[in-house]
């Protein structure tokens, strides 16, 4: 068996409007599909980032009253999402202008590249990595 690539990552959010604003208007994801699922009384938002073979989809499910993360970030399951950027420092500055705080920039001990973390509106850790 040979897997070609990761097609998408799915996350559950507690507030659809906040999550949509954060991922689309602040992080620059493109909306692929947006559907209200009447039978479940929730929203499913499919987003995309990257181009061509580097594109990946993020599926957002807005569930009513989801349980909070057990702890951060060390829990079974998804630990964090990491985004490749050309310039961590410039990206951190852009996020700061939008009121989004990042941890101090540090050097990844394995890749020797600059990296940092910040959090989405539900506290999901997000990484920036050069």
Which residues are covered by each model-predicted region?
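N-terminal beta-strand motif that seeds the catalytic metal site of vicinal oxygen chelate
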Residues: 1-18, 78-81
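Vicinal oxygen chelate
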Residues: 1-2, 46, 92-130
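Exposed loop/turn and edge beta-strand positions of beta-sandwich/beta-sheet ligand-binding modules
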Residues: 5, 41-43, 77, 112
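Short hydrophobic/aromatic beta-strand micro-patches
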Residues: 10-12, 48, 82-84, 129
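A short, acidic/glycine-rich surface segment
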Residues: 32-33, 42-43, 65-71, 104
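Mid-chain, well-packed structural core segment of small domains
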Residues: 71-77, 81-89
């Amino acid at each position: 068996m040979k897997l070609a690539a990761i097609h998408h990552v799915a996350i559950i959010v507690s507030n659809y409007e906040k999550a949509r604003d954060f991922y689309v208007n602040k992080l620059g994801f493109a909306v692929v599909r947006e559907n209200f699922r009447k039978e479940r009384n929730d929203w499913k938002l499919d987003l995309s980032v990257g181009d061509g073979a580097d594109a990946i989809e993020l599926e957002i499910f807005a569930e009513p009253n989801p349980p909070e993360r057990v702890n951060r970030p060390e829990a079974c399951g998804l630990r964090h999402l990491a985004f490749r950027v050309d310039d961590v420092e410039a990206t951190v500055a852009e996020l700061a202008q939008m009121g989004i705080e990042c941890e101090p920039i540090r050097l990844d001990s394995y890749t020797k590249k600059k990296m940092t973390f910040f959090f989405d509106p539900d506290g999901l850790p997000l990484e920036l990595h050069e």
